[in-house]
Amino acid sequence: MNNTAFSKLAETTIVYIVDKIEEQDIEGIIDVDLHGDILNLDTENGIYVINTQSASKEIWLSSPVSGPHHFFYEQGKWKSRIGFELMILLTEELGIRFDKCEIF
């Protein structure tokens, strides 16, 4: 994947995360703050930081629940080297449903 394709895919993914949170977090429990390619989510469990790393073509997640993760894109999913999938992890930790197929 070239840099342009990665940038577009990563941006689409982060915007998708923001849209799903705003759509489903009716009570406004999660405070969403997006600046460029850095997304901060202030939750009851702490602050999540999601950002893109163009050089390594990864999305990085810092979670107050499960710690740091690096995700690479493969076969339609953002996966970590230890087997986590970004959307499944966010669903479990945030209680927001992310339909993986909608991104692509």
Curated annotation (Swiss-Prot):
GO molecular function annotation: 2 iron, 2 sulfur cluster binding; ferric iron binding; ferrous iron binding; ferroxidase activity; iron chaperone activity
One BP term from GO: intracellular iron ion homeostasis
Stored PROSITE patterns: FRATAXIN_1, FRATAXIN_2
Keywords, comma-separated and alphabetical: Iron, Metal-binding
GO terms under cellular component: cytoplasm
Family the UniProt entry places it in: Belongs to the frataxin family.
Free-text function comment from the UniProt entry: Involved in iron-sulfur (Fe-S) cluster assembly. May act as a regulator of Fe-S biogenesis.
Protein known as: Iron-sulfur cluster assembly protein CyaY
